[in-house]
């Protein structure tokens, strides 16, 4: 891979209600606004040569990618390592309640039945490495806010923070291969010795 284009999915039924969903088995399609955002993403990407589209296991992500790439012959690959976090006891609940809980915790603390942030970062890094090893030149990754935010900040040299800024729906971040290697090194170093 030479170029990675990253885009968050469009607004979903859960995100519109500020609810968390880390279980890909739970149906969570896009809202009408999310479908419009996905089509707008397609217009943004219209002039891009895309050799492969990577998605997660989540319906909202696949739907966004399919709408954005409608009419184009682009193969898809599922990268489950880039799924949203497993929220455990917070699954299906308020995003604000989860954020309030998680911000006060260290990177090795997890909600019951969920993942801690060092696990999440390690999983994401493995997923990004899978993409980096792909033979295709340009890969579009449609994913979730958190993996994109971690990679975006790491590309600027910043390790994960206890509270990450949300990534806007259906916008594009471009990272060249030479930007990805140091960004992944930042994430791997943090995951090996996590601290906020």
Question: What are the roles of these predicted feature ranges?
Answer:
Residues 2, 7-72, 115:
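Active-site-proximal alpha-helix that buttresses catalytic centers in soluble enzyme cores
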Residues 4, 137-145:
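Generic beta-sheet signal
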Residues 1-2, 44, 77-78, 85-96, ...:
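Acidic, low-complexity terminal tails and accessory targeting/binding regions
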Residues 46-49, 131-137:
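Glycine-rich phosphate-binding loop signature in dinucleotide/nucleotide-binding domains
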Residues 55-56, 122, 142-143:
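Short beta-strand scaffold positions
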Residues 14, 28-29, 70-124, 186:
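Phosphate-handling substructures
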Residues 67, 150-154:
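Active-site signature of alpha/beta-hydrolase-fold catalytic machinery across serine-
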Residues 43-44, 126-130:
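A generic secondary-structure signal
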């Amino acid at each position: 891979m030479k170029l990675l284009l990253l885009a968050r999915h469009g607004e979903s039924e859960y995100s519109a209600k500020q609810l968390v969903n880390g279980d890909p088995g739970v149906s969570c399609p896009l809202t009408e606004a999310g479908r419009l955002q996905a089509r707008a993403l397609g217009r943004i990407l219209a002039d891009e040569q895309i050799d492969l589209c990577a998605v997660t296991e989540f319906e909202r992500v696949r739907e966004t990618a399919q709408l954005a790439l409608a009419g184009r012959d682009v193969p898809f690959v599922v990268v489950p390592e880039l799924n949203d976090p497993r929220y455990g006891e917070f699954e299906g609940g308020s995003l604000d309640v989860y954020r309030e809980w998680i911000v006060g915790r260290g990177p090795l603390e997890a909600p019951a039945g969920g993942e801690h942030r060092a696990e999440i970062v390690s999983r994401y890094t493995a997923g990004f490495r899978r993409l980096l090893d792909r033979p295709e030149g340009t890969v579009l990754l449609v994913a979730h806010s958190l993996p994109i935010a971690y990679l975006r900040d790491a590309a600027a040299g910043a390790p994960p923070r206890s509270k990450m800024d949300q990534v806007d729906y259906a916008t594009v971040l471009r990272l060249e291969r030479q930007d990805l290697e140091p960004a992944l090194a930042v994430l791997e170093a943090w995951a090996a010795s996590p601290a906020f």
